[in-house]
Structures are given as C-alpha cells and as structure tokens.
Amino acid sequence: MEIKRVGSQASGKGPADWFTGTVRIDPLFQAPDPALVAGASVTFEPGARTAWHTHPLGQTLIVTAGCGWAQREGGAVEEIHPGDVVWFSPGEKHWHGAAPTTAMTHLAIQERLDGKAVDWMEHVTDEQYRR
C-alpha cells in the first residue's frame, strides 16, 4: 500500500503552450509500473481552458466545483457542473475549461500508452470558445 499525502506533490501552473488563461494543476497520483493510470485536480479560472487535445486511451473528468464547458470536435459546447462525469473516447479531439464568469475544478484521470497520456494540439480560439 502507498498513501500520497495531501500537499506532498507541488502544484503547478498550466503551461501557456497547452492552456489559455490561469490554470493550476495539482498532481494527485501516477500509479507505478506496470499500472498506466494517473490523475490530477485541475482548476481553471473564469475563461481559462485547455488547448485542443486527444488521449490515446481516453480521459475521464469528474467535476468537483464551479461551472465548466467541454466540447468534442464537431459537437456542441456542453456545460458541466459538480458531480458530472465526462468521458472522452481514445483519440477524440476535445477541450475543456471554465465558463466565462465562473471558475471550475475537475479531477482528470487518464492512462499512458507507450509513456504518453496526451497529444496537445492548437489553442481553442475565442470564437470557438464563445459558441
């Protein structure tokens, strides 16, 4: 058994290459080999969001606070709230973040394939975000 204590892993700022706006990433766990799963708590300030991206084995989001938006390529922007669970299929291009006037926090859980859990793409434009 291994216990990760709260605060044992430093918070980090979401890199500008992958995020628009102010985003804080609090790593929660990365299971040791041979397990592939990792998780983090991610907080988006109002209007902050990820760039478009995919996950080779999919991603689960569990909204814990605030109000957010999520969109898959070709789909509508969906509003998400605490308690909502969002699943993105492997390879599904998507983004997620806070609503324009409200912060949002979610748990993000994904698995690694050949050591990689995410493929980052272009930023979500303001026009795409405001749809």
From Swiss-Prot:
Keywords annotated in UniProt: Lyase, Manganese, Metal-binding
Effect on the protein upon substituting A117V: Increases catalytic activity and enantioselectivity in vitro
Disulfide bond residue pairs: none
Catalytic reaction(s) noted: (R)-mandelonitrile = benzaldehyde + hydrogen cyanide
Effect of T20A: Increases catalytic activity and enantioselectivity in vitro
Cited PANTHER family: BLL4564 PROTEIN, RIBD C-TERMINAL DOMAIN CONTAINING PROTEIN
Full protein name: (R)-mandelonitrile lyase
Higher taxonomy: Bacteria, Pseudomonadati, Acidobacteriota, Terriglobia, Terriglobales
